[in-house]
Amino acid sequence: MVNYPHKVSKKINRTSPISSQRVNFANRGMSFEAAINDSNQYYLAHDIAVIHKKPTPVQIVKVDYPKRSRAKIVEAYFRQASTTDYSGVFKRHYIDFEAKETRQKASMPMKNFHAHQIEHMKQVVKQGGICFVLLHFSTLKETYLLPATHLIEFYQVDMGSKSMPLTFIRQYGFEIQMGRFPSIPYLEIVEKNLLGGESFENYNN
């Protein structure tokens, strides 16, 4: 069990060594989601991993049939996603993660996470999958990878009614130094810290 909200016995350096120079993907005209998608395209093109964004479910309300052989959707709306944003395979491991962004400087609102998403993450972790969240603080230009186990335990403390302090994220997560190719090199952290390092040994405990 982790001490909450931000008590740890020692300071741990959890910064990705990708680059000592911070690169802001926003300066390249990219949103956080676009940067993740761009990174996934890079991984796919270079035969590193196959990771895709899950389609948002759509509820069709009304359909017109201007011709017998054609159907035209005239009214529909997006439904709330039931799981997480991304999934795929990396080095024979199932990868599943959610991505969240905030303009706040000191915390990540837990209202951004829904109970069914937390439950999905629990199931992925239980089955041995690699599950995490990518958290981007746009004002600070900082991005972190937080293992799902820490998110789940924090969520269970107050059932998502509060915010997760940035101090907590910095202590239990891993900062991602932005790159150029890929824009968000999150898989290096996954490989180093979740597939072979000390963090992975306790990942599913």
Swiss-Prot record:
Gene encoding the protein: recU
Major location (coarse): cytoplasm
Binding site for Mg(2+): 83, 85, 98, 117
Organism: Streptococcus suis (strain 05ZYH33)
Catalysis: reaction(s): Endonucleolytic cleavage at a junction such as a reciprocal single-stranded crossover between two homologous DNA duplexes (Holliday junction)
Protein name, per record: Holliday junction resolvase RecU
One term of GO molecular function: nucleic acid binding
HAMAP family noted in UniProt: RecU (MF_00130)
Protein family: Belongs to the RecU family.
First-tier enzyme category under EC: hydrolase
Keyword Signal (UniProt): no
Sites annotated Transition state stabilizer: 100
UniProt cross-references to InterPro entries, sorted A to Z: Resolv_RecU, Restrct_endonuc-II-like, tRNA_endonuc-like_dom_sf
Keywords noted in UniProt: Cytoplasm, DNA damage, DNA recombination, DNA repair, Endonuclease, Hydrolase, Magnesium, Metal-binding, Nuclease
GO BP: chromosome segregation; DNA recombination; DNA repair
